[in-house]
Amino acid sequence: MGKKSKRYRAALEKQPKEMLPLGKAVEVLKTYDATKFDQTVEVHMRLGVDPNQADQIIRGSLVLPHGIGKTQRVIVFAKGDAAKAAEEAGADEVGQEDLAKKIKDGWTDFDVCIAAPDMMGLVGPLGRVLGPRGLMPSPRAGTVTPDVGKVVSEYKAGKVEFRNDKGGNVHAMVGKMSFEANKLEENIASFVDFISAMKPQSIKGTYIKGVAICATMTPSVRVAT
């Protein structure tokens, strides 16, 4: 493991040992020394799910109240009216076979990939490139949809996708350090509430085991739930 920076070590000394109410946790996070760039703020949730059980996979997307402070690059597989709607909504690239070939050749310079249902025959074989990068369109995530224009608009407005990892944890970006504290708090609360409402019926024990927030180059702050 690489040596932590002086700034990080200084922030670590301020790191609270106890869990804090969300508002206070955001306050503490924003006291960590600023860097020369606007750090991304993330929320990390430890869930009591078994990722090997199909009914306990936590996956989806939502539009945060104040966006994420980042313009996402969105590409779309669509044709006809759907392609036109995607272009009008601000998609960075819209295509069919030409776009598929570009990706097959290794191009992945985008954040979100959306596909109309009639394009999945073309998109399916791209799974070996898109899957490992978390970019494969999925009905469950809302990125396989007949209403591509609407979904493009949502991602451009700050929609975030999430899926639990192999350890049962869910992560998401929820804004930037430059956001006002109340806006960060509302974004985080919105995400946590959304995940809370997705509790699978098959889970009998504790569902949310821990919540923490951090920025790109800061220690985490644990949040009381």
Swiss-Prot record:
Pfam family, one: Ribosomal_L1
Gene3D superfamilies registered for this protein in UniProt: 3.30.190.20, 3.40.50.790
UniProt xrefs under SUPFAM superfamilies: Ribosomal protein L1
Keywords per UniProt: Repressor, Ribonucleoprotein, Ribosomal protein, RNA-binding, rRNA-binding, Translation regulation, tRNA-binding
Gene Ontology terms: cellular component: large ribosomal subunit
GO annotation, biological process: regulation of translation; translation
Taxonomic superkingdom: Bacteria
Molecular-function annotations in GO: rRNA binding; structural constituent of ribosome; tRNA binding
InterPro entries linked to this entry: Ribosom_uL1_bac-type, Ribosomal_uL1, Ribosomal_uL1-like, Ribosomal_uL1/biogenesis, Ribosomal_uL1_3-a/b-sand, Ribosomal_uL1_CS
Stated role: Binds directly to 23S rRNA. The L1 stalk is quite mobile in the ribosome, and is involved in E site tRNA release.
Similarity annotation: Belongs to the universal ribosomal protein uL1 family.
Subunit details: Part of the 50S ribosomal subunit.
NCBIfam families per UniProt: rplA_bact
Protein name as annotated: Large ribosomal subunit protein uL1
Species of the source: Rhodopirellula baltica (strain DSM 10527 / NCIMB 13988 / SH1)
